[in-house]
């Protein structure tokens, strides 16, 4: 009952105390607020003053920097103005100098033009003076021409009166005389041109051929057909023949070669048109003689083995020659046929070595004259390939070889060059003429070929017979071992121009009707002798 009363008292005391404290605070605030406002005002004033001084200091600093920049700019402007002034003065001086030079050059040019104009005026005056002189001379020439025409007419009339010939008759006589003189002059000019052409051609040919031969260093040995086998003793002849001729019959049947056993001491002769079979027989007979066992069985064995050896030798020889000539891609059959030429000779010259020599010469000459080197050397190497089988096939060896080359895949250019190297076909290409040339060079050089005395005499007689078969020929002589024919003609039957035609006709007939190694020179000699006696 007493607790609520106490509580009320406490609340009353607390309220009174709080009321007294609120009043003190109000009074304090009344005095503090003005002081606070005054302090704030003073602080603001001080801050403003400080800020103002700072701003003024910055302004003064900026103004100082601006003055410095202004002074620097003014200094640069002055420098630029000075430099611009100097540059303007320099440019002005240069311009004035150029103007002076241009004026001087213009003055010189005007002076030159003035001199040229004066010279031109003088030349014009000279030309006009010369033109007047020419016109005067033309009038004089015209007058002289008229006078000459009158004189010519008078002379013509006088000549017609004296000679009793009309103008047409006199013209015919003069034309005949001019025609004869022209014909003689033409023949003389033809001889001069042919002489010059021959000299130039010979000079160029000598140069090309000498260069080619100098570069061609192939070895050469003249071979002949070997048909005699030496025997150690005469007793071996009986062993070769054998009992009742068994051995010799077996040998001849197996080799196809005839063995001639005669009175020749210590030697037998082998006879066969096929050089390969003859070589097989020779080697086989030598082996049998060394071995000592000579009977049909042994003969068959040795001949068979020798045939294989000769086949291998021919193949190796063909490959060797193709390699030395640098001719690639040959058919194996062509290689074999090339090797067969090892045992073939022509006028004592080995045909295989002759073919190799022709190939090397053709390659060098083709390189010098710009021809096809591969075609030239291949055709030259194969040009006598027909001789390997010409005893088996009918026809000229050139055409036989061309057909073999065509059948074994050689190009038409090579086939044509092979066929034309003896004029069985007309040469149409440079390479064909080149093969003809190297064939003549290889076969015609001294010591390359030889022939028997009978054939030599018959060939000389045939040359003289061909030359004397023409009309107007007095005599003909084959000289220089048949390499030149000198034809003596009747001077009243053949003139100088006819001598040229006769030389060509004789050479052409020799080419068509005779066979000969190398080339033959035809010389026509026409001699006129006038004889008189002083009494």
UniProtKB/Swiss-Prot annotation:
Cystine pairings recorded for this chain: none
Membrane spanning residue stretches: 30-50
Membrane topology label: Single-pass membrane protein
GO molecular function: RNA binding; RNA endonuclease activity
GO cellular component, one term: plasma membrane
CDD domains: HDc (cd00077), KH-I_RNaseY (cd22431)
Any single Pfam family the record assigns to this protein: KH_1
EC number: 3.1.-.-
Function: Endoribonuclease that initiates mRNA decay.
Name of the protein described by the UniProt record: Ribonuclease Y
Organism: Roseiflexus sp. (strain RS-1)
């Amino acid at each position: 009952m007493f607790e609520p009363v106490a509580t009320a008292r406490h609340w009353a005391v607390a309220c009174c105390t709080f009321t007294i404290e609120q009043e003190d605070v109000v009074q304090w605030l009344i005095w503090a607020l003005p002081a606070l406002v005054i302090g704030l005002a003073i602080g603001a004033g001080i801050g403003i003053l400080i800020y103002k001084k700072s701003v003024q200091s910055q302004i003064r600093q900026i103004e100082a920097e601006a003055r410095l920049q202004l002074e620097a700019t003014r200094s640069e402007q002055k420098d630029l103005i000075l430099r611009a002034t100097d540059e303007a003065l320099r440019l002005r001086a240069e311009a004035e100098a150029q103007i002076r030079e241009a004026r001087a050059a213009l003055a010189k040019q005007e002076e030159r033009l003035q001199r040229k104009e004066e010279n031109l005026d003088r030349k014009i005056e000279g030309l006009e003076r010369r033109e007047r002189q020419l016109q005067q001379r033309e009038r004089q020439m015209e007058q002289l021409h008229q006078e000459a025409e009158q004189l010519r007419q008078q002379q013509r009339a006088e000549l017609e009166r004296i000679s009793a010939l009309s103008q047409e008759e006199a013209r015919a006589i003069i034309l005949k005389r001019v025609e004869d003189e022209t014909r003689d002059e033409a023949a003389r000019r033809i001889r001069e041109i042919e002489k010059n052409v021959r000299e130039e051609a010979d000079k160029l040919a000598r140069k090309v051929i000498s260069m080619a031969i100098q570069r061609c260093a192939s070895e050469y040995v003249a071979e002949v057909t070997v048909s005699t086998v030496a025997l150690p003793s005469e007793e071996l002849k009986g062993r070769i023949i054998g009992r009742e001729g068994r051995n010799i019959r077996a040998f001849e049947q197996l080799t196809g070669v005839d063995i001639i056993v005669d009175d020749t001491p210590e030697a037998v002769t082998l006879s066969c048109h096929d050089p390969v079979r003859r070589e097989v027989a020779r080697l086989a007979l030598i082996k049998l003689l060394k071995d000592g066992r000579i009977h049909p069985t042994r003969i068959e064995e040795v001949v068979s083995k020798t045939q294989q050896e000769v086949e291998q030798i021919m193949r190796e020889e063909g490959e060797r020659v193709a390699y030395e000539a640098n001719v690639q891609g040959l058919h194996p059959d062509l290689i074999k046929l090339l090797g067969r030429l090892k045992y073939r000779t022509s006028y004592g010259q080995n045909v295989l070595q002759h073919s190799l020599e022709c190939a090397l010469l053709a390659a060098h000459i083709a390189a010098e004259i710009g021809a096809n080197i591969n075609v030239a050397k291949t055709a030259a190497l194969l040009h006598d390939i027909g001789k390997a089988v010409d005893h088996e096939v009918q026809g000229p060896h050139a055409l036989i070889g061309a057909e073999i080359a065509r059948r074994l895949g050689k190009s038409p250019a090579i086939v044509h060059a092979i066929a034309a190297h003896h004029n069985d076909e007309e040469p149409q290409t440079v390479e064909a003429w080149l093969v003809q040339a190297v064939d003549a060079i290889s076969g015609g050089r001294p010591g390359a070929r030889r022939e028997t005395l009978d054939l030599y005499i018959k060939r000389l007689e045939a040359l003289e017979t061909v030359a004397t078969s023409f009309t107007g020929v007095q005599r003909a002589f084959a000289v220089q071992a048949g390499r030149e024919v000198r034809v003596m003609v009747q001077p009243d039957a053949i003139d100088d121009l006819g001598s040229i035609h006769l030389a060509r006709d004789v050479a052409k007939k020799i080419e068509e009707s005779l066979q000969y190694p190398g080339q033959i020179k035809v010389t026509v000699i026409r001699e006129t002798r006038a004889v008189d006696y002083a009494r």
